[in-house]
From Swiss-Prot:
Gene label: Nrf1
Cross-link (Glycyl lysine isopeptide (Lys-Gly) (interchain with G-Cter in SUMO2)): 139
The family this protein is said to belong to: Belongs to the NRF1/Ewg family.
Predominant localisation class: nucleus
Keywords: Activator, DNA-binding, Isopeptide bond, Nucleus, Phosphoprotein, Transcription, Transcription regulation, Ubl conjugation
Protein name: Nuclear respiratory factor 1
PTM characteristics: Phosphorylation enhances DNA binding.
Region (Disordered): 36-57
Motif, Nuclear localization signal: chain positions: 88-116
Tissue specificity annotation: Widely expressed in embryonic, fetal, and adult tissues.
Region listing for Dimerization, in residue ranges: 1-78
Length: 503
């Protein structure tokens, strides 16, 4: 009995010794892992403690370009933005500065939301004190936004004034020499960042014009309504009244939008003072970007080329030419075109803000055939017609015709609805083939060429007959400048929503 007790005691001692040894080994491994993590952090090229990181020549490096130089010359806020942009380029990030203030604001909101989610995940998973600090040293109200783990967030807020002071001093060291200002007019800036007049919103223009008038006229108040106070450069077709409200006639409002009229006021003022160079910030950069940007749907596809879709691993869809197997275009979204399309010659370029502003296309000598087999594909037919309508063309003739071959009633309804929405008052829908014969027999309006021309105002009368035959539907469009964004078509300042009718 005694022997058994001694044996059991020895066995327990052995187990305890093994456990202690295992704990020592775990402590050693944990220490090694922590040391490795710290070493990895110290090896980061963006760490301020790293001797290889030097921001003394941040604006003199190859990362600096015309954009950063333009920003740096705009003042403290622009200097801070230029330093941030140059830092990102120095670290080989494939991004560019967004010069459009409206788009830049949307990007800021989206990225801050993404940063907050990433930071929450980091602090929870890693268990470290971490924050995100965003600063724009504008006076008198600097932007100082900080969020993250407590108490580090509170500590940073406590030293807000010190951080801002040190940042302004650091930026002042890198700021370029101030240029002599010989202009009577202020540069166009939004929140301290230069902006082109064509990218200013209506609200920004309404707030800017009174300030511009102070510089131009030298008076503290514009003197609205007094003809003696009206500048000689003020447009004749715009009343000399407070720009916060549009007091023009209805005819003038229909002809020119209020936003465009406000831009004309600013342009006239700067042209009068000989400072047109201040109207267009980053103009050279934007011109180069637009020249190399092409739309994702089609770019100079040969006439009568039949293409089919092919899904790529990255989620995009390629248009493969039938017969040769060559890739003619890559789509960001499979819904942009139906399954099989015969594409006429298209040359399409996008503007910087992602919208389209071109003349209606003329598909000269070509035909775009959309093969639809279900009523639900009518939306695709509408989208494709819209893309064809805004595809860029150098010049177009009056009465240009777009031919669409539709194989479903819903698609015919949808395309005719879009035609009604987009054609001007003098426009017409032209039917040919069996459809024209059927409608012509009913109405007696078929001409010698076998075509039936229907005014847009009579659309509701004949829409039910559009899909009875399988012949193509020709939509004759007069050239008109328009802007299409998503599913809305803007004409003369009024939005027309595209309605899709299904069976």
């Amino acid at each position: 009995m005694e022997e058994h007790g001694v044996t059991q005691t020895e066995h327990m001692a052995t187990i305890e010794a093994h456990a202690v040894a295992q704990q020592v080994q775990q402590v050693h491994v944990a220490t090694y892992t922590e040391h490795s993590m710290l070493s990895a952090d110290e090896d980061s090229p963006s760490s301020p403690e790293d001797t290889s990181y030097d921001d003394s020549d941040i604006l003199n490096s190859t990362a600096a370009d015309e954009v950063t130089a333009h920003l740096a010359a705009a003042g403290p806020v622009g200097m801070a933005a230029a330093a941030a942009v140059a830092t990102g380029k120095k670290r080989k990030r494939p991004h560019v500065f967004e010069s459009n203030p409206s788009i830049r604001k949307r990007q800021q909101t989206r990225l801050l939301r993404k940063l907050r989610a990433t930071l929450d995940e980091y602090t929870t998973r890693v268990g470290q004190q971490a924050i995100v600090l965003c600063i724009s040293p504008s006076k008198p109200n600097p932007v100082f936004k900080v969020f993250g783990a407590a108490p580090l967030e509170n500590v940073v807020r406590k030293y807000k004034s010190m951080i801002l002071e040190d940042l302004e001093s650091a930026l002042a060291e890198h700021a370029p020499a101030p240029q002599e200002v010989n202009s009577e007019l202020p540069p166009l800036t939004i929140d301290g960042i230069p902006v082109s007049v064509d990218k200013m919103t209506q609200a920004q223009l309404r707030a800017f014009i009174p300030e511009m008038l102070k510089y131009s006229t030298g008076r503290g108040k514009p003197g609205w309504g007094k003809e003696s106070c009206k500048p000689i450069w003020w447009p004749e077709d715009i009343p000399w009244a407070n720009v916060r409200s549009d007091v023009r006639t209805e005819e003038q409002k229909q002809r020119v939008s209020w936003t465009q009229a406000l831009r004309t006021i600013v342009k006239n003022c700067y042209k009068q003072h000989g400072r047109e160079d201040l109207l267009y910030a980053f103009e050279d950069q934007q011109t180069q970007t637009q020249a190399t940007t092409t739309h994702s749907i089609a770019h100079l596809v040969p006439s009568q080329t039949v293409v089919q879709t092919f899904s790529n691993p990255d989620g995009t869809v390629s248009l493969i030419q039938v017969g040769t197997g060559a890739t003619v275009a890559t789509l960001a979204d499979a819904s942009e075109l139906p399954t099989t399309v015969t594409v006429a010659q298209v040359n399409y370029s996008a503007v910087a803000d992602g919208e389209v502003e071109q003349n209606w296309a003329t598909l000269q000598g070509g035909e775009m055939t959309i093969q639809t087999t279900q009523a639900s594909e009518a939306t695709q037919a509408v989208a494709s017609l819209a893309e064809a309508a805004v595809a860029a063309s150098q010049e177009m003739q009056q009465g240009a015709t777009v031919t669409m071959a539709l194989n479903s009633e819903a698609a015919a309804h949808a395309v005719a609805t879009l035609a009604e929405a987009t054609l001007q008052g003098g426009g017409q829908i032209v039917l040919s083939g069996e459809t024209a014969a059927a409608v012509g027999a009913l109405t007696g309006v078929q001409d010698a060429n076998g075509l039936v021309q229907i005014p847009v105002s009579m659309y509701q009368t004949v829409v039910t007959s559009l899909a009875q035959g399988n012949g193509p539907v020709q939509v004759a469009m007069a050239p008109v400048t328009t802007r299409i964004s998503d599913s809305a078509v803007t004409m003369d300042g009024q939005a027309v929503e595209v309605v899709t009718l299904e069976q």
